[in-house]
Every structure is written in structure tokens, then in C-alpha cells.
């Protein structure tokens, strides 16, 4: 979710390097002369490898351009924003990080679901729902099933059935409330509520 600071930087951008799954209305803040470069990926299909993105950011910055890197979701939560920042700094480029509001909290809130609530959940965890080694992730989910608190799984739709199965096999009651939210910031927004036993999209 964007902030006023982010919108102000977009107005000044000479180059915008942007991801998939962003709110396209944000690009309306850019001036007409801004060079817009799409580097997104979806479902494992990359328009550009991460190393190429790093090199592109460095190249444009070395041209003296004011570059804005607009990442989908939270750039520092499973978003590789830290890798890009470290690459640029290691090559002598000054960076400024302008945080938005993390989707892990904002999207559930938009759906009327607080991640913590008195007498229900006093903590929450954020877990990736997609990784190269899914077997180890399922094992981690099973092992964490005994923990209290709200679990937020980002990018987990493809593996929803396996995630819920891992939670139940780890000891979470089947009637534990669950929700699936997709398209949190665009017109594809959809929410489905249920339990671990029956949730599906």
C-alpha cells in the first residue's frame, strides 16, 4: 500500500523500474517523460532475471537518472528488495528506502481481519507460501502448527491445499478459521472465508 512519500518520489522519477502486481494507478503519478521499464514475474515466469534487474538499476543510476524501483508487495518481505539495495550500495550508488504499508497487515485489514485481537491472537507470523524447496516449507509449517497466533502466508494460493494439510497434520484443529485473499489492491480483489478443513478458492 502506497504512502504520500512514495507518490512524491514517483512524480520526480526519470526512470521507473516496476514489478508485477502493483496498482497501475501509481504510474499515473509519473511525468510523461519518465522511462517505464517492466521487470515483473508471475508464477515463476520472469521477464528479467534478478541479476539483470540489478544491472539495469545500476546502469540507469550511473547515467545520472533518478531511478524509482517500484516493487509489488513488501520489498523487504520475500521481495528481494534487500538484495537490490545491497548490490547498488556495493557499487557506490546511494539509495533511499521509502516503505509502504506491508500487504501482510494491510490486506487482511481491508478484509476486516485484524492480525491480532484481544483474547484471540496476541501475535502473528508471516511465512512464504512459495519457495524452491516446498518439502522443507511444509515441514516447517507442520512444526509451527502448535504455535498460537495468526499465520499470514504470502504467495500461497498455488499451494493452498498443501499448506492447510500441513497445518492440520501438525495439530491445528480442522475448524480453525481461515481466509484466502487475492488481488488485494486491484479490481481482481476477492476474499473467501472458511476453515482449514474446507477453505478453497
Model-derived segments and their meaning:
Residues 62-67, 131, 135-201:
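A contiguous loop/helix-start segment that scaffolds small-molecule binding in enzyme catalytic cores
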Residues 4-101:
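Class I S-adenosyl-L-methionine
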Residues 34-41, 92-96, 115-122, 171-180:
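Short hydrophobic/aromatic-enriched beta-strand-loop microsegments
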Residues 4-9, 31-34, 83-87, 113, ...:
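Short, solvent-exposed amphipathic alpha-helical segments in soluble enzyme
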Residues 26-27, 88, 107, 163, ...:
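Hydrophobic packing residues within well-ordered alpha-helices of enzyme cores
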Residues 1, 44, 131-132:
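Short, glycine-rich nucleotide/cofactor-binding loops
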Residues 72-147, 190-193, 197:
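Class I SAM-dependent methyltransferase SAM-binding "motif I" and its flanking Rossmann-like core
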Residues 17, 68-69, 126, 152-154:
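Structural motif
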Amino acid at each position: 500500500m502506497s504512502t504520500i512519500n512514495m507518490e512524491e518520489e514517483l512524480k520526480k522519477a526519470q526512470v521507473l523500474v516496476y514489478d508485477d502486481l502493483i496498482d497501475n494507478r501509481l504510474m499515473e503519478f509519473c511525468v510523461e517523460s519518465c522511462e517505464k521499464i517492466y521487470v515483473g514475474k508471475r508464477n515463476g515466469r520472469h521477464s528479467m532475471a534478478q541479476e539483470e534487474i540489478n544491472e539495469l538499476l545500476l546502469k540507469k543510476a550511473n547515467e545520472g537518472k533518478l531511478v524509482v524501483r517500484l516493487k509489488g508487495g513488501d520489498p523487504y518481505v520475500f521481495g528481494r528488495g534487500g538484495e537490490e539495495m545491497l548490490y547498488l550500495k556495493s557499487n557506490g550508488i546511494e539509495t533511499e528506502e521509502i516503505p509502504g504499508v506491508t500487504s501482510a497487515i494491510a490486506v487482511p485489514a481491508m478484509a476486516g481481519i485484524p492480525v491480532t485481537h484481544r483474547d484471540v491472537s496476541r501475535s502473528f507470523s508471516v511465512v512464504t507460501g512459495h519457495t524452491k524447496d516446498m518439502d522443507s516449507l511444509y515441514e516447517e509449517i507442520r512444526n509451527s502448527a502448535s504455535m498460537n497466533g495468526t499465520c499470514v502466508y504470502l504467495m500461497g494460493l498455488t499451494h493452498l491445499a498443501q499448506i492447510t494439510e500441513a497445518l492440520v497434520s501438525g495439530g491445528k484443529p480442522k475448524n480453525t478459521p481461515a481466509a484466502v485473499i487475492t488481488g488485494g489492491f486491484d479490481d481482481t480483489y476477492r476474499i473467501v472465508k472458511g476453515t482449514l478443513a474446507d477453505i478453497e478458492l
